[in-house]
Amino acid sequence: ILLSIARTFQRLPEPPRRSVIIAVVTAEESGLLGSDYFATHPTVKRENIVANLSLDMPFFFHPILDIVPYGAEHSSLSKPLTAAARYLNLEIGPDPFPERVIFIRSDHFSFVKKGIPSLFIKSGFKTVAEDPVDRSVSDLAWRSTTYHTPRDDMTQAFDFNAAATH
C-alpha cells in the first residue's frame, strides 16, 4: 500500500507543494519504538514536518463507507480531513472503542508528543447495504482469531476497491 501511495505521488502531473516522506516503522507493539525513534530523530528538521498520517493494519475485507480518524479531536488536521472524506464520499465516524484508548497506543502518538499534528486513519465498520455481515463483529472476530497467528497470511479476503479508497 505504501509503495502504491509513493508511486501515486510520483505520477502526479505536478509535485506536491511540500515534500512527502513515507516512513515504514516497526515495534509498535513494543512501545512505539520505530515511530518514537523517527519522531525524535527525523530525517528533516522537525519544524518542517507539518503533519503525520499513520496507516496501520488496514482492514480491506469489505467496501468502505466511513473512516475513523483517531486523534482528530486533538488535531489541527480536521479541516483537510473533512475535505478529503467529502471528496471520497466517506463519512467520518467516532472512535468505536474509546475504552481501548487507541489514540495513545498507535504510532501517530509519537508525533503528537513532539507537537506534530497527526492522525491515525482506519476504515470504519459501515459498508454497503447488501453486505449481510455486521462488520463491527466480523472485524473484531478476525482480530481475536487470526491477527498475529499463522492464519494471518496472504490468503485473507481482500477488497481492492476498498484499498484504493483508503
Q: What role is predicted for each listed range?
A:
Residues 1-32:
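Alpha-helical metal-binding/catalytic segments enriched in His/Glu/Asp
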